[in-house]
Structure formats: C-alpha cells, structure tokens
Amino acid sequence: MKDYKHYIGTIITHSGREYPDFALGTYLRTEDEILELLKVYPYDKLMIDTAYRYNNEQAVSSAVIKSGYPQNQIVYIGKINTGQQESGNTVREEFEGTLHRLRIPKINIYMIHSSRSSKYCKTWIEMIKLQNEGLIDSIGVSNFGIAAIEKIYNQSGVYPEINQIVFPQNASERDMYDVQKIIEYCQDKGISVQAAMPFGGSKRSNELSELQRLVILKQLRSQDLTCVFGTKNIQHLCQNISWIEFGR
C-alpha cells in the first residue's frame, strides 16, 4: 500500500465534525483526469467535491476504486439539485441515487446545490431527516445568500454546517463585497465556508501570478475558509495546498 507521508490540516464544523481544509473539485473533470490526479496524490486525507449536476458521480467512484486510494481516508461531498424534484423524484430517491453512483453506504457532506428553486426549504427539511437516520454526517448548502439561509433556518430551526460559495470570475469590488458579507454572516452563525474556485475560475487563475495566488490563499486561510481546487494539474494542486498548510 502507498505510504502517504504528507499530512494536511483540518477544519472543525459547529457540530464538532473534522474535515480536511481543502477539497478536490471535480466539475468538468473526466474519470481519466480524476484518476491521474489520484494516482500521484500524496496526502493522507482526501475531500472530494461532487454533484449530481456535474454528471460524473460514477466516474468519480470508478477513479477512486482504480487509484487504490483508501476509502476510509476519503470525505465525500455530494449535492442535490432542487430542480431534480420537478421530475417527481423525492429527495430520498435522489440521495439514494447519489449513494448508488458513488458506491458508498452513506455520505459525509450533502448540500443543496443552489437556492434558485422554490423547493429548497422542503429539500432542506428532508435532508435533516436523512441526517437523523445516520445517512449524512453534515448537511450544507451551496451558493446560498443570507436571505436563503435565514429562510431555511426559520422553517427548520437548523443552520447549515457548511456553505460552499463559488468565487465570481472577473469579480468586481462589489462582487467581492457581497461575498465577504456572506462569509461574515456565516461565521457569525457558526457556518463553515468553502471557497470554490478561489481564484475566480480557470481563466482568471491563469492570469494571476504565483504571488497573487499566494496572497489570495493566505487571505482565505486567515478567515479559516476551506478551498475547493478544480485543477487537473497535480503540481498546481500540491503547490496550492502547500501554501495553505504553510499559512496555518
């Protein structure tokens, strides 16, 4: 078995759950691309970000199995698209579909992918039931603003443990002000924040110098944010992670 000699830090949520302080994003990634990363992935823990909408849950599962990376060292993030229920499927059916495609008996983190559908409050209440059954460790949301979080809390009495926020491409000062307000609100409520595409997407990331990327990551780590990296370049991934760990 491969000896994973590199150790990474953790973030603790308000429920006391402990998760790696970065995640591997799989948006637009194929099975082969994920497999190539996992073959040389040198760290002792792996948090892997998936979603029904990415249409690659089965590809992620196959890549993990083929890579030989220990399943007991993996934290899975899954996301339900509230629009899926327009087809008549229940939250439970969609959740069980994710477990089946990922080939796992339960999931570590399960999120609502966005608040665009009017059904997100109903979805949230059903997710609480699944968590109470022991099928989900932590429930969260993705790209929820303050008003949407308040709405699900008012209807359920339960705040998300995690809010994953995609950082806007070509972000204006106003965009980043809005993101910062959400981060501050979440942290005030004890909600952990994940920064997806922390450099604003691949196009913007390629335009940034190493120093600029380092400054961004240090700012995010100073706020205890988890970063979700979607790169398919293992050198870039390891460099970003090393900067995060150095800044701890």
Residue ranges, per PLM feature:
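A short, structured active-site edge motif that brings together acidic residues
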Residues: N72-Q84, N108-H113
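Short, acidic/polar
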Residues: R29-Y41, E86-R103, K122, I146-K151, ...
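Beta/alpha (TIM)-barrel catalytic core signal, keyed to glycine-rich beta->alpha loops juxtaposed to Asp/Glu
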Residues: D3-Y7, E31, S114-R248
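CE4/NodB-like, metal-dependent polysaccharide N-deacetylase domain
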Residues: V91-M111, K129-E133, Q155
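Active-site mouth loops of central-metabolism enzymes
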Residues: D21-D32, K79-N89, S118
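N-terminal binding-site loop/beta-alpha segment at the start of enzyme catalytic domains
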Residues: M1-I74, P105, E126, G200-K203
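Short, well-ordered coil/turn segments that N-cap beta-strands
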Residues: R17-F22, D44-M47, Y69-I74, I104-N108, ...
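Short amphipathic alpha-helices and their capping/turn segments at secondary-structure boundaries
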Residues: T10, S61-S67, E94-R101, Q180-Y185
